[in-house]
Amino acid sequence: MELEFLGTGAGVPARQRNVTSIALKLLDERNEVWLFDVGEATQHQILKTTLKPRKVKKIFLTHLHGDHLFGLPGFLSSRSFQGGDEPLTIYGPKGTEEYVRTSLKLSESHLTYALKFVVLPENGVIIDDKTFRVECAKLDHRIASYGFRIVEKDHPGELQVEKLQADGVPSGPVYARIKNGETVTLSDGREIDGRNYIGNAQKGRIVTIIGDTRNCEAITRLAENADVLVHESTFGKQEQKIARQYYHSTNINAAKVAKTAHVKRLLLTHISARYLGQAVRELQNDARDIFKNTRVVSDLDLYDIPFHGRKE
């Protein structure tokens, strides 16, 4: 599981930062990539990475402001042109489907795959399958804006082969049943409870991605105990009044959430073009005064999300 930042800027593209798009790479977990927001020129940023558009199976839009959205029609068309033929699901606020369908219709763009649209509820679970659970919550922005909590399901414990061998359980197809936790009867009449031969489950990871917002209660709930919190930081601590006026967050807002929610790592993105060089370092350092494990991300940064231990 990795996060790749395709764009980390705010408002409009800049030399140092493109507008927002984040790839959650789940290649080992389900051979997929999920995109969160698709700002203008996202597909140009993808050309600088190893990411394959056909691997993108889900797209999540935090809100419908242009710096999070204007790259979507072009990406969808290029995915089709480059051999993508598997269905793609887009999760977004009301109006997402109208925007996409209209853009494709007026440009006479024809896709080689089916699109499915899911309108985000104000709060609720939008995905719950064998490997992941995803919930969203409405935030506090000028228009409807959402945050997402992506929870990986726990990985089953490993089969303790050495223990089985020590207890004289011969290898064979029976091991598969034991790994499933079944009770099996051996040829010598012994009953083996599979649950006694499975190690502790590997606790799944949690990633929280927060769209444009002022500070609000929903953020802390979405971020609770997350391995990684990706939070917008449009402004620095000196611009708290401006941030609130424009329905955005500061680095200090984000750091306080990370501390309160007991997250493991805070990644700050959606950085205003006014912050360059030393100013970016100050954004990071000021946040670290509150929450030490903080990083201001840059375009094309790639972060691995490691496991953090097994369940007791």
Swiss-Prot record:
Binds 2 Zn(2+) ions. The keyword tRNA processing applies. InterPro entries: Metallo-B-lactamas, RibonucZ/Hydroxyglut_hydro, RNase_Z/BN. The keyword Cell membrane does not apply. Zn(2+) 2 binds at residues 67-68, 212, 270. The active site is at residue 67. Zn(2+) 1 binds at residues 63, 65, 141, 212. Its EC number is 3.1.26.11. CDD domains: RNaseZ_ZiPD-like_MBL-fold. Zinc phosphodiesterase, which displays some tRNA 3'-processing endonuclease activity. Probably involved in tRNA maturation, by removing a 3'-trailer from precursor tRNA. Belongs to the RNase Z family. Homodimer. This is Ribonuclease Z. It comes from Latilactobacillus sakei subsp. sakei (strain 23K) (Lactobacillus sakei subsp. sakei). The gene is rnz.
